[in-house]
Amino acid sequence: VHKMGIKDITICASSLGKAHDPIVPYIEDGTITGIQSSGVRGKIGEAISTGRLKNLAIMRSHGGRVRAIESGEVHIDIAFIGAPTCDEYGNMRANGGKSDCGVLSYAMVDAQYADKVVAVTDCLVPFPNIPASISMVDVDYVCVVDEIGNPAKIATGAAKPTTDVRKIMMADYCTKFVV
């Protein structure tokens, strides 16, 4: 996209952290001029805070992001969705590959409302990849890459698995209560 000279892009991500720091030069050169997210950390947050983003950054809750997309307040031209597993037709799942993650629910609204949807995976599996979190009916293209993410950079802050015994015990109690 950058090499093609496309400018004035708005990124509407569920969250941006240090794994996304490499986009800062594209903020500085005007390729990326807007950011809408539920959270921004690292060098991107610093770039926004120091006025290097041309337009205002818009922060919403995860649910607010969904509402904005569903209502048409936010229009998504192209959604690139990282999928730990995907078949050749675009059925995406969050597990079964080398980059397993939580659920793909944050990306479901993107898949349903974007003009074009690209499933990006590092684990192409045989059809049908079921049960699919995101169905092939919402996917236009499948792109296979070497690695969809770096867990060391993604699992930070609230998304970082804890080793704190007290927090693990609290989570265990909550699970027992709910179940």
Predicted regions and their residues:
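Conserved alpha/beta enzyme-core scaffold
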Residues: 1-179
